[in-house]
Design a protein with these regions (language model features):
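Active-site-proximal binding-pocket segments
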Residues: 72-197
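Glycine/tryptophan-enriched, flexible segments
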Residues: 2-130
Length: 197
């Protein structure tokens, strides 16, 4: 992140002037609007975090981000993922509040670039030798992991939170993913598919 910040200027944090380029887009009449249910989605009554960020959360991010029992994360990941909040605006505003938070935004963009330049990582390991891992892939253990019934309290709490709210604290996500792959020796793609579900 030091190299990234070394070349960062105010220009990079300004909103991109895309309106003047909109005339280059293909003009089409919109088709009928298809609702989420028609696409196979089911309303679960879950609410997404708002896209407003709290300065206090960002200020305390370094100290509180790894503590699952406090609201120490921004909960903006869904908005960053789908572009409903501007990464440039967030970096410009939040970067001055907490360097650690800015570093996390940089890491996010780094992995976006990995996906762009190495699209095979969607279904394969980045390092080919990791594709030779002999996974156990025990279906009973995987079902227990999915349900939050492993007997490991933090893993179970994280999976139950995910199953009931659609959210899991970042540090807990790392713990449950590591548990799945390194303790249970279950292929990471199984876990990824469950998280995407």
């Amino acid at each position: 992140s030091r190299k990234w910040k070394a070349v960062l200027t105010e220009f990079h944090l300004k909103s991109y002037p895309c309106r003047k380029y909109a005339r280059h887009f293909l003009k089409q009449e919109p088709g009928p609007f298809m609702g989420l249910e028609a696409m196979g989605f089911t309303a679960l009554g879950q609410s997404f975090p708002g896209k407003e960020w709290k300065g206090q959360t960002i200020r305390n991010y370094k100290e509180q981000r790894d503590i699952p029992s406090v609201q120490g994360t921004s909960r903006l990941s869904v908005h960053l993922r789908f572009g409903t909040i501007s990464i440039r605006q967030l970096a410009a505003e939040a970067g001055g509040l907490n360097e650690t938070f800015l570093n996390e935004l940089i890491w996010r963009d780094f992995y976006q670039m990995i996906l762009w330049h190495f699209p095979q990582v969607v279904g394969q390991a980045f390092k080919p030798e990791y594709d030779r891992i002999k996974w156990r892939n025990n279906e009973k253990e995987f079902a227990a992991w999915c349900a939050g019934n492993t007997g490991y309290p933090i893993v179970d709490a994280g999976m139950r939170e995910l199953n009931s709210t659609g959210f899991m604290h970042n540090r807990v996500r790392m713990i449950v993913a590591s548990f799945l792959t390194k303790h249970l020796l279950i292929d990471w793609r199984w876990g990824e598919a469950w998280f995407a579900k």
